[in-house]
Amino acid sequence: LTILNVLKELKEPNATFSSVAKHHHISVTQTQEIFDRFVQISRQPLSKVLCMDEVYTQTSRKNKYSCLILDFLTNRLLDIVYDRKKYSLLNYFERIPKEERNRVEFVIIDMYETYRTVVYRRLPNAKIAVDSFHVIKNFNQAVRNVRIRIMKRFDKKSDEYYLLKKFSWLLEASDVRENRSKFNKRLRRYINYPQILDLILKISPELENAYKLKKKYAHLNRYTRYDEADKKLWTFIDEMKGSPCPEIQKMRKTLIHWFE
């Protein structure tokens, strides 16, 4: 009886695993297990432009992450694979008719190597596009690593350490806009965020180089036309070669590895 009541309540538009579990005095995991056991969602046909993304699924399974298969253009969920291991995804796509798989033209993924392998082996006509969000995320991590390395050179009581620590978010912000100046007791002056960013970049030529390269990539990603993207990206990758930062050289290798 409990199972039937749980399934019935899960049909409600506003129902969540947590709310249903609380109402029936069972755990969220038990509620999810009931759903997984008795509810079978039909797979939707593959679209021409797919997106493979991961989601954390807190179930009793050994696998913490599931793979979502989505129509990239409509954001419609096509299917869920409750495991993102290579053999599971290869087997999943193998069961889909080859004619249907061959119609897929593009697949958008993050920088998870398994997704790339699966696309190459099971979706032979598809081109891979790495989600720009994840590229920017990796660039921000590279800049963050440069900042931390530079910061460790300074005494914790120094102004340089203070700026690099307290205002680190300015280096990762997509846009640092002009704001009203406020008095900063530590710096003993009225100052706004763009001015603080300038002070941070003057601390280290390496940090300034890493930051400017990250901003340049973000600009290329946003404004470059498809027909000129190949040439401009390779020019940018070549420019990265001159960076003195090992963190940027690592990022350069990542871009080359994923270039297609």
What does each of the following model-derived ranges do?
Residues 1-8:
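Basic, short loop/linker segments at the boundary and entry of helix-turn-helix/winged-helix-like folds
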Residues 10-12:
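Short amphipathic helical patch at the helix-1/turn junction of helix-turn-helix
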Residues 14-15, 102:
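Residue-level signal for the short linker/turn that defines the boundary of a DNA-recognition helix
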Residues 19-24:
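Short alpha-helical "recognition helix" segments of helix-turn-helix
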Residues 26-118, 125:
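RNase H-like nuclease fold core
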Residues 110-113, 119-166:
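Conserved beta-strand -> loop -> alpha-helix junction used to position metal-binding or nucleic-acid-contacting
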Residues 155-227:
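An anionic, glycine-rich sequence signature occurring as long contiguous blocks
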Residues 219-260:
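Amphipathic alpha-helical
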